Amino acid sequence: MAAPRIAHLAHKSVLELSGPDAQKFLKGLSCKDVEYLAGGYSGFLNASGRVLHTAFVFPRSKNSYLITHESPEDHPAPLTSLLPPFKLRSKVRIKDVTSQWDAWSAWGSDLQGGPSPIRTWKMGSGGASESHWDWEGGVRDLGLRDDEVGCWDLRAGWPHMGRQLLIPKGEKPSLATSHDLGNMDDYELHRMLLGVPEGPTEILPGHALPLESCMDIHGGVDFRKGCFLGQELTVRTYHTGATRKRILPVRLIPLDQTSSSSISDLLSSSPQQSLDEVSTPLDITYHPPSSSATRKPRSAGKILSLHNAVGLALVRLEMAERCWWSGDILRSSVSQWLDSGAGRLTTQVNGKEWGVYVGQGEAYAAALEHMSSSS
């Protein structure tokens, strides 16, 4: 078992909402109930239901909240600019407090023996799947100092993503005594392997849809709460639409692989070939099987981010199902797979063609299992 790790998320900004109307104000704008499970994953949409920000909300009291988010200089709607126009006469103060707090993530702890949350699913139409968590007897204590703030990160089940933390600026987290100090690369690889998209590179502001961005299965959207900005399209899609694409984990497969090892063994090992710096997004192409009446390649999605040969991609689910999720193709070697005439997904990286394996990620796999057992 890998040692637990803790990493500073230096790219995250921190916003504070405070005042008598802070709770009401936040409830009208965020797509998750701000009091649910004492904080957690949420987001902010535009009026047409497109994602502008994913965020973590940390309630400090009924009248005070801290929010971590990513608003780089090229963001079309920074959170510090998005929220103030909605204040009107609300008694709420909006303040950037990034200079006061550092965002951290801690994962990999042995949490056996204590209280564990229970996940249930509420299913919509066309593949929409709302993840809902409950703690019997109250939310488990995070084990933090009094001056630290945190919440459980349940995007990829329990306890895979561990804790999201806010630590007073420049101070060492108390959990650093029981966790190895990691870095941003460790955090990025960890969440990518679990199929957890995050931030404007992967969830494109003003374009990405909540369900395609897996905010439903990661517990970031509440389809039954009161009105919030962007609710109409989101709820309508949940009840009557179809989710044909999702952001899922991918692994690049070298097509010149000569090993007799199975693709399954290849996927479970560390990448043997490192990639030079790669500019994303990258187009994914679907090549129909040799038995298909139509052999013309088609677009299957885009790779949004890469960490060496591991990444996240917005993929057409139908094509991932055809290529990877049915049959025994994972037992084949790469050469057997290519010779079989089976359908496949590929991409071009720096002029070289690679195979693209699409995984389901923790949350989508759990949702599919629930749908299968309920049918």
Swiss-Prot record:
GO terms for molecular function: transferase activity. GO terms for biological process: iron-sulfur cluster assembly. The keyword Mitochondrion applies. Its main location: mitochondrion. InterPro entries: GCV_T_N, TrmE/GcvT_dom1, YgfZ/GcvT, YgfZ/GcvT_CS. It comes from the Eukaryota. The keyword Membrane does not apply. Pfam families: Beta-barrel_CAF17_C, GCV_T. Belongs to the GcvT family. CAF17/IBA57 subfamily. GO terms for cellular component: mitochondrial matrix. This is Iron-sulfur cluster assembly factor IBA57 homolog, mitochondrial. Keywords: Mitochondrion, Transit peptide. It is found in: Mitochondrion matrix. It comes from Cryptococcus neoformans var. neoformans serotype D (strain JEC21 / ATCC MYA-565).
